[in-house]
Amino acid sequence: MNYQLITTDDGLSEVCSQARRMPQVALDTEFVRTRTYYPQLGLIQLFDGERLSLIDPLSITVWQPFCDLLLDPAVTKYLHAGSEDLEVFLNAFGLLPTPFVDTQILVAFLGKPLSYGFAALVADYMQVTLDKSESRTDWLARPLSEKQCQYAAADVYYLLPMAIRLVEETTSAGWWEAALDECRQLCQRKQDVLAPEQAYREIGNAWQLKGRHLACLQKLADWRLRKARERDSAVNFIVREEHLGQVARYLPGSLGELGALGLSGPEIRYHGKTLLELVAETQTMDAAEYPEPVINLIDYPGYKKAFREIKDLVQQQAERSGLSAELLASRRQINRLLSWHWKLAPQTHVPELLSGWRGRLFGEPLKGILANYI
């Protein structure tokens, strides 16, 4: 397939200007995320139905034309399994494409598995077998090989015609508005940024700690997340999660004690002093300053029975609607609903199972179940 490699600001401006004359475009990104907190953008693929462009972010400095395209309300942006691509756009440009449609969400409303891959979709709709051998390539290395470019180009070349068909099929099936709603919810999830002071709640065994020990974990997790974002490093490359838990549990007072708890040499060398300072700060806190204990949801009274009732309702709705139970409600969504209902976690948005298309489909009977679990 023919493509052009865009390496200049003028070239980007020209292809974005043309793309904005079209009603829809297909987008994809290639990125690297091994030791970093944020994804490192390596390539952007853009197909407007006439011109296929591979945009090299390493050589472009003026991104306003591309941002204007992403925000153009007259141009629908199609991606497949776009969750990580949205994160890339947020990190690189501080915005999300709109209007945005994820074709993986569309096929889920047409009866395919929730994580239906792009290669399988192309095989189904285009009778083409994609070469996925470049999927683990280093997209930050230059120059890009012809094989890399062909691999990247295929992702949008086949996506656009399939997307148009999938919109028609989803509309005919009566699920178009629900699918759009699900795409909006995906965007909302990507914009919900974890507050550092709440990071301790994401630590696996936080529910085992109380009082001063939990206060210490809160300080440690807050510091680690801020440091990871500041240095653009994966959090476990700062200090491993299990080591944070050990420090909070035993409240060490020396570098030697950190080593005895299993912390690595680099962790102690680079961060040992800071960890000990945070432990010392905890020792001077008043009990009134300690965070509330983290409740282990699965041990909460009534959890197992409530979860089972909700799963039964979801299965009934799946059979009635023709949608998969997996699409209707994941375990994570059910757990968030119950945590919200019992006020076990900070209250933010209304849970997804009670809002949007899910709320319209089975929100009332779901509220009926929740009413039995005060």
UniProtKB/Swiss-Prot annotation:
3'-5' exonuclease domain location: 3-171
Main location: cytoplasm
Molecular functions per Gene Ontology: 3'-5' exonuclease activity; nucleic acid binding; nucleotide binding; ribonuclease D activity
Sequence ranges assigned to domain HRDC in this UniProt record: 210-289
Cofactor(s) essential for the protein: a divalent metal cation
Gene Ontology biological process: tRNA 3'-end processing
SMART domains: 35EXOc, HRDC
Record keywords, A-Z: Cytoplasm, Exonuclease, Hydrolase, Nuclease, tRNA processing
Reaction catalysed by this enzyme: Exonucleolytic cleavage that removes extra residues from the 3'-terminus of tRNA to produce 5'-mononucleotides
Subcellular location: Cytoplasm
EC numbers, comma separated: 3.1.13.5
Keyword Nuclease applies: yes
PROSITE patterns: HRDC
Function: Exonuclease involved in the 3' processing of various precursor tRNAs. Initiates hydrolysis at the 3'-terminus of an RNA molecule and releases 5'-mononucleotides.
PANTHER family cross-referenced by the UniProt entry: RIBONUCLEASE D
Family per record: Belongs to the RNase D family.
Annotated NCBIfam families: PRK10829.1, rnd
Protein name: Ribonuclease D
